[in-house]
Amino acid sequence: MRMIQAYLCDSVSGEPYTCKGDLCEIPFNRNFTIDLVNLSVSTEFQVKITMTPHHDLGTFVVEPKNVFSIKRAVKGDAAFKVERAAGWLPDTPQVLTLFVYERLNPVEWHSECMYENLETDGGTVIVPGEATGQRFGTATEVPTMFLFKRMFVVKGV
């Protein structure tokens, strides 16, 4: 069992969606959250999240023994301001990829740091390219070691 787990959950009820392998079927009119669960008592993890077509959703730090919920909308073209290529059908599955790293030298977090790509707060709807009013704490950049990649195929139903 991995020390960090990821779930796609209904944004209203908080219930995890049932995935068959890597395929997760989510209604197009529903939002989902990406819940990162750190089961370790001492290890910090850093998770980079991308979603096709070619959109970087950010890099997030998950403290030990913590659940970190990131709310995202399902329809990538509307929620992520992604321009789909010609011929891309609305019901074409999108791939959500999580790259998981172990933070090798965890240190105290400092709000004065200006590493824009490391976010340490979740639980709010974030649309890249639009101001949310949410002030994220920033994590100190530390060396990392790549652990694994997890992919979800998000299919609208």
UniProtKB/Swiss-Prot annotation:
Keywords: Early protein
InterPro entries documented for this protein: Frog_virus-3_Orf82R
Pfam families per UniProt: DUF2888
Name of this protein: Immediate-early protein ICP-18
Originating organism: Frog virus 3 (isolate Goorha)
Lineage: Viruses, Varidnaviria, Bamfordvirae, Nucleocytoviricota, Megaviricetes
